């Protein structure tokens, strides 16, 4: 047992001071040569008032371990931290605490920064960013102005998702299961003037370029499904007796002969005007009732509701009259907000037609045979066309591809590609966000704030609580709202909505590398040298929010020449969540939060870092158990004692020590590269136990093996690794050592254990030379089971290094 005990407090204090004086992550090597960069980034946090718990630590530790590993491989590491401080999370906390968001956000950042420093991550705080800093949001506003000038930012009034608790509009991506993803309140609809970003213009590129990315397939599929590309046709249905037509989008234009009615979303622009005197009251009531429901409520598999408008359209393929209905299962923001209904071949349409006694005409049949008295829709995608005029007898699978072009040739529609992705609702009726840099002029219309006048600063207010009226609190500040038009000088008014919390986070990763530049978002020189991000780490919950928006922003900035790449993150890793007991998410309200502060005090940062990884596979959720950190702490003490007991002994490396050293390097390296980090920690434990056994026999372990252990430990437990490295006589930092390499030949066993079988059943296990020939192996095997060889030997089998099998009769 070492005479000097492992003292984590003294060791961690010592090395943090040394790293402060002599940073280990430098851009140039000893010869003055610039190192190749590696940009590893963890998603920056909301500065929550509750501070960090052990669940938050997991992602930070994973990110730092990977960064330090790359540092040991000779890279200059860009590893940064900042604050996603605008938006609903920060503002809702401020309202709850009764403190202005500017004050509460600054206090929260100070506390979380203190906690993050306890992790001892390799952060370059000179690169720190904060989305609420005017020097940062100047460029968030600059991007918006550029998008406006390119026609990607536009105003529109339409029914949006409305959170009655947060009192603001929400993008579709912010609604989960019909609830606000931030506060959990039921989402309703509200007609409001909104700023939109035309992300749909990039839909094809966002979809196709997923193939470029080294991302989890799960995330790529989530984005592909969200973008939702489909092929079909837009078909024009003339409204009977009116000089108007209703356009529908369908992926099955081959079923047009079976369209016996139409359904419009209650928000459709023609919905009210299609009503007649008899139906008007019912139609207007239905439109109002639908406006009070969320999209999720409307799409649920429950009994369909609807109202007949009193008007008819003409099916353009056969001239048949089809009644026009309204139903809330059709959404205004998908397709055209109107659908043609083919009840014989769609479950929802069949249910609706059956309920309201609408004709059902089968147009696709298996083997061309019509079903008598249909009791359910025939939804097989293939079959023979029937009741379809000149299309009868054709295979539906062939006609499905041809029909869009036939419809186009006849002048009744167009072949179309459609996307489920909708334009991004970009404005929020809240105070704590980036002001949208637009001036509303009665003469000139919407005019952007001149770029040289950015940032347009968020004014100080006394009343920052949301109004709930659809107006932002900024609307009440007359001296800020009233201004002159930048274009003509006339009296004008500023835009009073603010940007969503995603505005800054959609591009922040670019700013880290040039955060003091007041002339450009990022200089082209810095961008070419340090971007894009090589490894991005964060939760999968951002798959169709932040990750999609960041890809959109990057493609736009590529298009206008700011950067020379169009994807922000080469590689993505999604870590799982650490939960309390029984898999319950940690939260202050549930009383199951585990603070890292006490654990760092009692066990040390290194122990907590390693346990964060050991708790389970990093991509899966894991349940926290305080007892586990005790085991990791004992492991570090055993490593400490092994080194301290051997460091002054003159031990020559034996073949067994060399083999164990190379096996350790192999196991740690291959598991780390595969990101199965929990098994890296178990590899350390297994090999350390083996080294302890060898040390007992040999009186210690050689310095090269112990030094290798220190280097391998350095990304995981940097303080103790530095201390052990120094104790072993090295004068420079362990992070200048370089990552060790393994030799597969050195790992080979001299002796191997091989089972000996008779007719496939093991009768003995023998040790033979790893290089034994077939004859030598069989001779040793037969000798071991000589007393059991009582019959005629039919066959002798040796699978090298695996098994010996004697077949007897």
Describe the residue ranges of each PLM region:
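Conserved oxyanion/phosphate-binding beta-strand-loop segments in alpha/beta enzyme cores
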Residues: 1-41, 71-80, 104-111, 215, ...
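Basic, alpha-helical terminal appendages of large translation-related enzymes
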Residues: 1-22, 27-37, 265-268, 277-280, ...
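Residue patterns forming the tRNA-binding/recognition surfaces of aminoacyl-tRNA synthetases
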Residues: 5, 14, 18-22, 96-246, ...
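N-terminal catalytic cores of NTP/NDP-binding nucleotidyl/phosphoryl-transfer enzymes
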Residues: 30-99, 105, 128-143, 166, ...
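Catalytic alpha/beta core of large soluble enzyme barrels
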Residues: 63, 76, 268-367, 372, ...
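Helix-rich, typically C-terminal accessory recognition domains appended to large enzymatic cores
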Residues: 149-161, 415-444, 501, 566, ...
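Amphipathic alpha-helical
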Residues: 200, 205-229, 265-307, 452-484, ...
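Alpha-helical recognition segments enriched in aromatics with Gly/Pro capping
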Residues: 311-317, 321-334, 363, 481-618
